[in-house]
Amino acid sequence: MTSQLFAVFRREISVERAGREALVTTVPFVAALVVLAGLAFGPSPRDLAVTGPGTAWLAVLVATIPLSRTVAGTEVAEDSWDALRGLVAPGALFFGKLLAVWSGLALTWLLAGGLVVVLFGVPVPPQSLYGGAVGTLALAALTTGFGVLTASGARRRGLLAALLLPAGLPALLAGTQLASAKVPVLPWAVLVTLYAAVVLVAAWAVFPALLEE
């Protein structure tokens, strides 16, 4: 299973390098959202300091929508999705896709957070790194599951925003609080950890059924 997992992950990275679909759709969107938010909330440094962490996490949450379309979109377009899910074990396919999406969301979080630090002048507390790692993992599990669920039909893809955004709210809230100054760390760290564990286990458990859709 491990060899299949990393084979799927390497394939995802190779596909992204060749097409740069996620890069082209995500980076300009995140940059535009952060810049526009800075213009809307500014120019008061106090207002920017309050809204900065939430802006970064909102960008990450909304970025799950275009990223979810890349989970199985290439295989469906090439008519290779049926062959892939027939040859690769469901667990290996899930975790290989998950690692690829997690990498994309982690880079998105780093980009959004870096822009917020530069443009908003918001410091980075140490606990925000934990929130970023665990929160993006939870969102990656959601994105992988919903990406596979909606890959087989155009009508289903229209439901992505309605499914992903509400389901990702705990990561948005906990990540924002962990990136904010003078906020109790432990309750939010526990929340994002439990949320990530529940989402990861649930997505893994239902993934074989999603492959049959």
PLM regions with names:
Residues M1-T26:
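Aromatic- and glycine-rich beta-strand/loop motifs that create alpha-glucan
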Residues E16, I65-L84, E213:
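Transmembrane helix boundary and interhelical loop/hinge segments in multi-pass membrane proteins
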Residues R20-G42, T55-T64, L163-A174, L194-A202:
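Hydrophobic alpha-helical transmembrane segments of multi-pass membrane transport/permease proteins
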Residues A141-G147, L169-S180:
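Transmembrane alpha-helical segments of integral membrane proteins
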Residues A89-V117:
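Selective transmembrane-helix segments that form parts of the transport pathway or gating/packing helices
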Residues A112-T136:
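Secretory targeting signals
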Residues V118, A196-E213:
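Junction motif at the cytosolic side of a transmembrane helix
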Residues L129-L165, L211-E213:
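A structural motif at transmembrane helix-loop-helix junctions in multipass membrane proteins
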